[in-house]
Amino acid sequence: MRDITPDICDQFEDQVTLLNLPLQNFGQRTAFHGEIVTVRCYHDNSKVREVLEQDGTGKVLIVDGHGSCQKALLGDQLAILGIENGWEGIIVYGAVRDVAQMSQMDIGVQALGTCPFKTEKRGVGEVNVTLTMLNQIVQPKHHVYADWNGVLISKEALDF
């Protein structure tokens, strides 16, 4: 994979903002981008599953798990679901699990960290809402660009 975010910053510096979160890469695809779809949830990944069941062609799911690493909001089964439905990547402001398997899967995955515990399944959460993570705003329908160097957000799709 090539580094995409430095090139984007060089070419579109005034059109992007840095999503300054301490994220780590867990998927095989370490550079990915797409239109943002959002989920806000806490210790319940029901809405994550609902969204990943939809067509994700050209899209990246950003999950606001309130920064909690006490339950994993994404595991190998949901990552497989994302791959089957064409998602470019998933960014979790929280924890993931099954990371050995996920590292072999052709999908971008970034998260704060790992946790072996699964979440509850109560159908709780919000989809396509504005997220605020560490005082940074993420809007649905904006665009995200992620790699080892960081995560960038733009209002429009960038031709790079």
Swiss-Prot record:
The keyword Cytoplasm does not apply. Keywords: Lyase, Metal-binding. Its EC number is 4.1.3.17, 4.1.1.112. Substrate binds at G75, D76, Q77, L78, R97. One of its GO terms (biological process) is regulation of RNA metabolic process. Pfam families: RraA-like. Its cofactor is a divalent metal cation. A divalent metal cation binds at D98. Gene3D superfamilies: Ribonuclease E inhibitor RraA/RraA-like. Homotrimer. Belongs to the class II aldolase/RraA-like family. PANTHER family: 4-HYDROXY-4-METHYL-2-OXOGLUTARATE ALDOLASE 3-RELATED. This is Putative 4-hydroxy-4-methyl-2-oxoglutarate aldolase. It comes from Vibrio parahaemolyticus serotype O3:K6 (strain RIMD 2210633).
